[in-house]
C-alpha cells in the first residue's frame, strides 16, 4: 500500500500545540499528531514544507523543508506548562543537501513574548548526513516557548538570515538542561549559565566576578534612572548559534558565543581582576532607552552609549577592563578612547568612529562631572518618540543629545568643549555614516 504524503505549502495555517508536558518528544511518525501539534511558518520567499512518512532516521517519519531561493521556512510547536526561569535544552537530528547562506539549517525560538530574538542552535550548511544540534533556552514569563525547526532564519545579522537548500528534521526533544552540561551560578542581578567544560576557575572566583557585575548593573541604573526587564535578573548564557565575529548578543538572556574564548576571559578575571569588557558592553546595551522604553530615536548608535555607560560604571566602581592587551582601571578608560580620537578627529580626519565621539563625551565629563549626564539621560528617557522633534540625521541626534547635557550643565557644552573644526569633522563623519 502506498504511503500517504502530507504536503503543507507555505501559505497553510494549522493549530498550535497546547500540550503541558515538560519533556517533549517528536519523531514525526504520526501524521495526525503532527497536524495537531505543529504549525508551518513561512516568513518570506518560496519553498515547501512536507511531513514525510519515511526518509527519517531508520526510515522513520521526518519533516523536509526545501527552497531553491533564499527563504525562511519552519515548522513550529508551542510548549506550555514549562517552569519559569528554568533552563531547557531542545535538540534535534537533521541532515542537509546543498544548504547555503544565512543561518542555514537551524533550530530557534519564536521570539513572541521573549526578551531575546536571536537564540539559535549551531548553523548547519552544505550537504551532510544525520547529526544532532541543540539550543538552550528559558521559557517566557507564562512558562511557554515555541520551538522552530527551520531552513533559514526570519531576520538576519550581517548574513541576512535566510537560506536555500533542503533540510530534513527528525527526533526533536525538549528536556531540562542537565547540571552535567551546564554550569550555573547566581547573584543579585545576574544568572550565569555556561558550558561546564569552559569553566576553569573556582566557584568563589565566579562569585567574586558576579559581585562586580552586580555593582556595574547598579551603576548603569544610577546613570540612566531605569532598569531593564522590570528588575528581573539578567541571564548570561553560552550558545553555539551566533555568527562568526560576534562576541555576544544583548537581550535577556545575553547570548555568549560558545566558540569564542570563554575560559581565557574567566581566567583573566582572576589573574588581572579584569571585569570583562565584552560582558559589560552587552549589559550596557540592555540599559538602552529602546530596550527599556521602546523609544529613544535620539540614540543614533547604541554601540557608543553601551560603552559610555560602561565608562561611568568603571569610574564609579573602580573596575578594570582590558583592551589591546592593556588594562584600564576606573577613569583611566579615557586613555583608551583617546587612541581613536587621535587617529580620526584629532588628526583632522572625518572618519566615522564611535569611540572617538565617546572620548569627546568623556571630555565633557572631565569638565562638568557625571551629574550632567545622569540628569540628561533622565530627561531623555522620560520622553517618548512623539515628544521629540524630527531629527533628520545622526548629526542632528548628536546635537539633540548634547542639548540635554547642556540643559543639565546650565551652559552650552558644545560651545565650551568642542572646537568649530571638530564639529565640522564630526558632522562630515556622521554624514558619511548615513550614506553607508
Q: Language-model segments: what does each one mean?
A:
Residues 26-30, 63, 75-103, 133-139, ...:
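Extra-cytoplasmic beta-strand recognition segments
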Residues 184-286, 290:
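Juxtacatalytic substrate-recognition/specificity segment
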Residues 30-62:
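Extracellular glycan-recognition surfaces and repeat-rich motifs
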Residues 263-329:
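Zinc-dependent metallopeptidase catalytic helix centered on the HExxH motif
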Residues 220, 332-425:
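Active-site-proximal alpha-helical
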Residues 105-107, 132-172:
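Extracellular beta-strand ligand-recognition surfaces/modules
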Residues 19-43, 173, 180:
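Extracellular carbohydrate-recognition regions
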Residues 113-145:
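Extracellular carbohydrate recognition and processing domains
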